[in-house]
Structure formats: structure tokens, C-alpha cells
Amino acid sequence: MGKIWSKSSLVGWPEIRERMRRQTQEPAVEPAVGAGAASQDLANRGAITIRNTRDNNESIAWLEAQEEEEEVGFPVRPQVPLRPITYKQAFDLSFFLKDKGGLEGLVWSRKRQDILDLWMYHTQGILPDWHNYTPGPGIRYPVTFGWCFKLVPLSAEEVEEANEGDNNALLHPICQHGADDDHKEVLVWRFDSSLARRHVARELHPEFYKNC
């Protein structure tokens, strides 16, 4: 019986032991200021605990509801380990979307934000509680520091001009006249590099950051 663990049984163990040693030495991830409760939980405890469930956390409830949806075109479950968003990740994502195009000037809708959030969750393991904005009316600033896109309302003239022509689909967000917004404003994403240096949301709403 004592010979069950022979030398041949230990093949590969030194490599596994080294991986285990490195794992225990990995520094804790510091979430970006403004990341939500589930992300804070993940950063502080290494997992999402019963402090954040579908019954008491909107992001968790929303994610569980999305797992049954197939309209976004990719799997909802993440392909990488869950992790809280950091300042650098929010910053890098902002410039990636700016450089690659597509988000700047795009009319905001809840569905479009959901698609972006699900893409981040699926490809990066980032929980969607990073993607929040200050309340309106007017410009909505990102709650998470490092995210450099704000939501800017269009004027009535801009909305009217954008609606001209016969090619606009009736269900396009610009034609919905702010149906997804509490203040019925038509909002567009605008890149603002100064948001990487100045946390406007925290200046305007310090009460949002009491637990950060």
C-alpha cells in the first residue's frame, strides 16, 4: 500500500505546485471606483457571496434572466473567470471603442447597453454593475471611474433632423423619442477623455460612493 504513490505518480507535480504557489501570491484586484456591490464583493472575497443574489442585487437578477435569452448572438455565460472591472480595464475599453468606432454618437437604448454589458461579461468576465450613469435630465456621467463615455441628450432640432427621410426604421432608438429614458430625452454616447482624469460623477453625487 505504501508504494501506491511512486515516483511516476509525481510526474508533473512540480509544475502544479508552482502554479498553486503563484496563485496564492496573486495580488488582490482593486476594483474601479464606482463599480457595483457584486464587483466589490468579488474583489474583497474572491467570489460573489449571499450578500449579492438575484433577490437583492439588480445586476445578478438581470444576468440570470439573460441566460435564457438568445437574441444577442453570443453565449451569455462568461468564457473566462469572473473579475471586477478595474480603472485600467474601463480606460482601455473606452479607447478601444473610440479607436474601433461604433459607440461614439450612437443613440443610447437599454437594449444596446445590455448588448455591450453582455459582451463584456462573456468575453472579459466583467459583471454589468460597472455600467451606470448619473441621473438626468441633462448629461449623464459614468459612475465608474475610467469609463470615458458619457450620455449626452440631443436637442429637439437634432432629433427632428435625424428623423427626416423615409429610411428610418420605426423601432430605431432615435424614433422612440427617449422611450427608455426616465426624462424622455434622446441620448447618445460621447467620448470624453477628461473623464479619465476627473471623476465628475463623484463630484456631483458623493452619496453614491459611501461604500467605495
From Swiss-Prot:
Chain intervals for the UniProt region annotation (Mediates dimerization, Nef-PTE1 interaction): 114-130
UniProt signal peptide: none
Family listed: Belongs to the lentivirus primate group Nef protein family.
Statement: the UniProt record of this protein carries the keyword Signal: no
UniProt site positions, description: Might play a role in AP-1 recruitment to the Nef-MHC-I complex: 20
General remark: HIV-1 lineages are divided in three main groups, M (for Major), O (for Outlier), and N (for New, or Non-M, Non-O). The vast majority of strains found worldwide belong to the group M. Group O seems to be endemic to and largely confined to Cameroon and neighboring countries in West Central Africa, where these viruses represent a small minority of HIV-1 strains. The group N is represented by a limited number of isolates from Cameroonian persons. The group M is further subdivided in 9 clades or subtypes (A to D, F to H, J and K).
Post-translational modification: The virion-associated Nef proteins are cleaved by the viral protease to release the soluble C-terminal core protein. Nef is probably cleaved concomitantly with viral structural proteins on maturation of virus particles.
Transmembrane segments: none
GO cellular component: extracellular region; host cell Golgi membrane; host cell plasma membrane; membrane; virion component
Region (Acidic): 67-71
Site (Cleavage): residue numbering on this chain: 62-63
A biological process term (GO) from this entry: symbiont-mediated suppression of host antigen processing and presentation of peptide antigen via MHC class II
Segments carrying motif Diacidic: 180-181
Domain of life: Viruses
Protein name in UniProt: Protein Nef
Keywords: AIDS, Apoptosis, Early protein, Host cell membrane, Host Golgi apparatus, Host membrane, Host-virus interaction, Inhibition of host adaptive immune response by virus, Inhibition of host autophagy by virus, Inhibition of host MHC class I molecule presentation by virus, Inhibition of host MHC class II molecule presentation by virus, Lipoprotein, Membrane, Myristate, Phosphoprotein, Secreted, SH3-binding, Viral immunoevasion, Virion, Virulence
GO molecular function: GTP binding; SH3 domain binding
Keyword Secreted: yes
Renumbered residue ranges of the record's region Binding to ATP6V1H: 154-186
InterPro entries for the chain: HIV-1_Nef_anchor_sf, HIV-1_Nef_core_sf, HIV_Nef
Factors inducing expression: Expressed early in the viral replication cycle.
Subcellular location per the Swiss-Prot or TrEMBL entry: Host cell membrane; Virion; Secreted; Host Golgi apparatus membrane
